Amino acid sequence: MSEAGRAAAGPCPEVSPSRSQQLGGLLRCLRDSETRRLELERKLMEYKSSDAYLMKLKYVKLKKYLEEVNERQKRALLRNQTFLNEFNEFEAHVKASSSELIEKMVRYGREIKSGLSFQEGDLARGDKEEGCNEQMPQAARQAGIHAKTALSRSLHHPVPFFMGHCMSACSVQQETPQPAACPNSLTALQGDETDGHPTQADDDMQHANKLDEQGGKSYVPMGEKMSIRDSSLHSSLLNFTERKNSTELCSALPDGGSLQSRTADLASDTSVEEVVTREHLVASAKEVCEQPVLLASAPEPSITGPQCNLNTQQAASQDSSSSSTHPEENYSLQPPSCCAAEDEPLGSSVPEGFCSQDGSLKEDLEASEAAVLCQLPEAKSGQQWDVATLQASLNSHTAFLEEHEHLCTEELAAVLHSTLDLDEEAPGSQAPPLLREVLAEECGDGSSVQSNESSYSLPSIPNDSREVEQAKHVLWLDSMGKQGCVIGNNGSEAKESQEMCSERSSSSERSGDLSRPEFRKGAITAIKSKAFWGESDDSSSEAVDALRPQTRSPEADDFDDFYD
């Protein structure tokens, strides 16, 4: 310690020499220890930087890595050993079940092959069906059938004809003929054509087949108008006879149904009521007079099949009871199938004159009677009336109407008494006395069958909602009968006939205030008077005169009132 320090510190106690020596010795030891430390540090640094130290470090690291690798190897060996054991077990299992797997593989292979073959067969059949479906319209067109009506033609039956008009626009179905159903159909092909004209039924079938070639439309060109001739009359008679004789056989068929069931259907059907004004009546009459008679009517409001079928049968029966038949001409016509009338499809379109829209059976019978009387002059003068056939047909038809309760006894007597009186006036014919007595007893004084005036007039139906429509029906039938007289003549005579029809329509319009029974009586009487005076439709020179009856007796003055 310096002298200044000591002076500043102040006075201190004096140090003994022994103490100073101890202190000097300690200082020297400290200096030596520090020097040694520094030397050791230098040596350490030299050792760390030496290669021996570095190699030793690497050795230690490699030794640790080797230990780790050995440990991993041991674990891998254990894992591989486990996998080997599992593989051995799986191999043993596969060897044990190889036979079962082979059997399953074979079975699955057969199932796959069968499934593929089945699919191929379905595809082949589908291709064949598509080919057949494509060929069917072509075959139908080659056969003269329209593609749109091919299906309907396979479901319907031959078209019945009445009074020279096509009763339905449906097509023909080819069915297996019944051996005992129509015995007269075999001899119908062997009859000689005494008229000198082709049969009307064959012509009608040919025209019906031509309809599809013209696009399926139900009309006939102007040049193919048909005249109402003896062949059409005998065709309707023969059709009714065949249907009457084969009613029992047709009732046994599953698809034909019985006549009683069809009558029940007729009773259950409700007719559509229409309110027709007088202007519409006159316009319809003029339109009918201007249009030619067509084979198939245009699309009109249709009626049900059973109702149309029954009306057609009754009209044919009235036809057979009021006109004569000729054996040679009957055999020259081939009737349709015995069940064709009963199998007529529902909803077929029918002319208004024969199956009215309101479904009045009595009105159809009266109209059919008037139309049949128009054809009576066409019968040959030397032809003899078959009284037995007419009487049997009339009796069967009367029993049919009474059985099915379509007309009451009074209405039936009123409708049929004019036919009975006409049979009395015809040469070589007699009215059935028994039938007349029965009708007279049941009807009483309501309808007289001995009056000359009643034989040419029909009783009036009570006024109801169908009064105007029935008057329209009679007017249409009257104009239709007049048109049938001039169809076969030249154009000038047809024009004159149309003018006469128009004049009659105007006359009916002017006389609209007349009562309904008087108008109906005048229309029907005018038609019957033509048949009564024996005017012929075949004569072209008397075509115009036939439209107006000639006055030959005071009784005929009542006929002229209709034209005034």
From Swiss-Prot:
Q: Give coiled-coil spans as residue ranges.
A: 28-50
Q: What does this protein do?
A: Centrosomal protein required for establishing a robust mitotic centrosome architecture that can endure the forces that converge on the centrosomes during spindle formation. Required for stabilizing the expanded pericentriolar material around the centriole.
Similarity-based family: Belongs to the kizuna family.
- Give the region (Disordered) as residue ranges: 1-21, 178-201, 304-345, 442-465, 487-519, 531-564
- TM spans, by residue? none
User: Where is composition skewed (Low complexity) in this entry?
Assistant: 313-324
Identify the taxonomic lineage of the organism of origin. Answer: Eukaryota, Metazoa, Chordata, Craniata, Vertebrata
PANTHER family noted in UniProt: CENTROSOMAL PROTEIN KIZUNA
- What InterPro entries has UniProt attached to this entry? Centrosomal_kizuma
The residue ranges flagged as biased composition, category Polar residues, are: 447-463
Originating species:
Gallus gallus
Protein name (database record): Centrosomal protein kizuna
Q: Residue spans with biased composition (Basic and acidic residues)?
A: 493-519
One of the protein's GO biological processes: spindle organization
Alphabetical keyword list: Cell projection, Coiled coil, Cytoplasm, Cytoskeleton
* Location within or outside the cell: Cytoplasm, Cytoskeleton, Microtubule organizing center, Centrosome; Cytoplasm, Cytoskeleton, Cilium basal body
- What cystine pairs are annotated? none
Gene that this polypeptide is encoded by: KIZ
State where it is primarily located.
cytoplasm
Q: Which GO terms describe its cellular component?
A: cell projection; centrosome; cytoplasm
